[in-house]
């Protein structure tokens, strides 16, 4: 039902709720839809609708995620909420539900807890650009000084993970009071105030089409009399006939010119993000290009072999490994369209990684791959997915 109602004439932004178990993430999600429904910006959902999150698969991993959508005066939002902590870890690492920003929910009665810390760290590692805070359950705290103490703790915690803790907006309220229609100051008004901070503080993401051109190579053909065609789906940006492009990854970077773009056997002047195209390359031989490389705007992306990853390792039940792995483990890393072998080094003081763990790993690939921070990958053994990861930092 809700699908027809939204006019896509506002800028779109993807957000989510993060924070410790039982601090009120799902209740807040419900409260936002209920309050915004009053002005026609959402379809009201109750807690049970959101909590019964459907399963979905991302990079071979099953994740439970609930999606709701709503709009404010300024923007249209897709909002993701996960039922369990493991779902958050998997979601953020696989990028199944992209987050342009997140609402960190902290209970005023408890203050920051272990998963509060872990979700902030994950947000930092996977590159969530901005966070705002909703301090929930203030109806359970009578002492104003205690609220100030919790706020100070949250700000210090955010700063310790390189978020601007002093500047991040913190809204105090109670999602439950908002749903029950109680005291509007901590109920409805707090939800509207929170949405204003989300509108104002979370930056509008670049649309894929506005970013520098990038297309992972899926296949290569040679067409007699015309040259070499590489096919794939354009991930970002635009490529125009006559423009210079680079072929990056696996071997030395090559420069060439795009002499044609084809889609559905029709010739185009340009291809753009989302299009499945064939790109004709001038003077490039069939054997100069292979699957796993990328075609890109010159200088926009570089090949690397060493990086720091944040990874989630599947449990046995999820089809992953049955046993832990140790330092010098050599699986395949599946980037975009191809597998590359890499060596994992565990961090100082970490003896092994168990199935179901998420951890920071140092990785060295045997061949360079075009990468930047935030690139997602799967960890595989003989074609079977055993984990998922994201490039947190490039080393060389």
UniProtKB/Swiss-Prot annotation:
InterPro entries on file: EF-Tu_GTP-bd (IPR041709), EF-Tu_GTPase (IPR050055), EFTu-like_2 (IPR004161), EFTU_2 (IPR033720), G_TR_CS (IPR031157), P-loop_NTPase (IPR027417), Small_GTP-bd (IPR005225), T_Tr_GTP-bd_dom (IPR000795)
Enzyme class: hydrolase
Annotated region (G2), positions in chain: 60-64
Major subcellular location class: cytoplasm
Chain spans, region G3: 81-84
Protein biosynthesis in keyword set: yes
Stretches for region G5: 174-176
Cell compartment(s), UniProt: Cytoplasm
Coiled-coil ranges from the UniProt annotation: none
Domain of life (superkingdom): Bacteria
EC number, as in UniProt: 3.6.5.3
UniProt-annotated stretches for the region G1: 19-26
GO cellular component, one term: cytosol
Pfam family, one: GTP_EFTU
Location of region: G4: 136-139
GO MF annotations in UniProt: GTP binding; GTPase activity; guanosine tetraphosphate binding; translation elongation factor activity
Binding site for GTP: 19-26, 81-85, 136-139
Family under the similarity heading: Belongs to the TRAFAC class translation factor GTPase superfamily. Classic translation factor GTPase family. EF-Tu/EF-1A subfamily.
Record function comment: GTP hydrolase that promotes the GTP-dependent binding of aminoacyl-tRNA to the A-site of ribosomes during protein biosynthesis.
Quaternary structure and interacting proteins, as annotated: Monomer.
Official protein name in the record: Elongation factor Tu 1
Species of provenance: Caulobacter sp. (strain K31)
Organism phylogeny: Bacteria, Pseudomonadati, Pseudomonadota, Alphaproteobacteria, Caulobacterales
